Amino acid sequence: VVAFGGRVLASATKGVKVKYVNSPESEIYHKSNELYGIYFAKQAIVKQDRCFLVEGYTDVISMHQSGIENVVASSGTALTPGQIRMIHRFTNNMTVLYDGDAAGIKASIRGIDMLLEEGMNIKVCLLPDGDDPDSFARKHNSTEFQAFISEHETDFIRFKTNLLLEDAGKDPIKRAELIGNLVQSISVIPEAIVRDVYIKECAQLLHVEDKLLVSEVAKRRETQAEKRAEQTERERRMAERTAMMSQGS
């Protein structure tokens, strides 16, 4: 045990209006480095070679009680590089479970590019309106829950494309922004073959030529490489200065 974490069941409870209440950060507890449920889930994740990602504590507890153990929670925060590496130690496959809150989904998908950057296979499953993983798990056993996921989960890039297309409608400016958004997600994927597959599929969905997306992805990757090189150089100079200061003292 490294900290306490709680879910506020009524936003008006004693004036508390936040969704989750956690212990303050300490020498042993850094929220960005923890995944709720990982200790109990890791064996099931390895065995099934898949991890389910949910938002909160009650989602994990109810899914465990229903018989689904390969599940962890980000505790209401965007995934951090440390959390992603923790999951990636056990599997390359993740399914993110969302409730029907469109605003929440759009906010959450912004952080999934980091999973793609790690080369992970990401899928998304949207639960029925009015349900979250907690309530859905309390209504269904593990077989029914797993069957629903298998039937409704979608590849992340395809899910993101359809979600943003619905939001953009026929607005040309929004559609241009949509293309830029998708290009950014595809560009961080390390495997060239996977990028090529996504480019072809997105080109069909967006009714644009493959070569346009190929060109834009190449530009983004070049920019990313330049930024990484600059960061490496900054770190090298910082290390040199630190070493010189140590020698001087």
Where would I find each of the regions flagged by the language model?
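A charged alpha-helical hairpin associated with nucleic-acid processing machineries
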Residues: 42-51, 78-94, 99-249
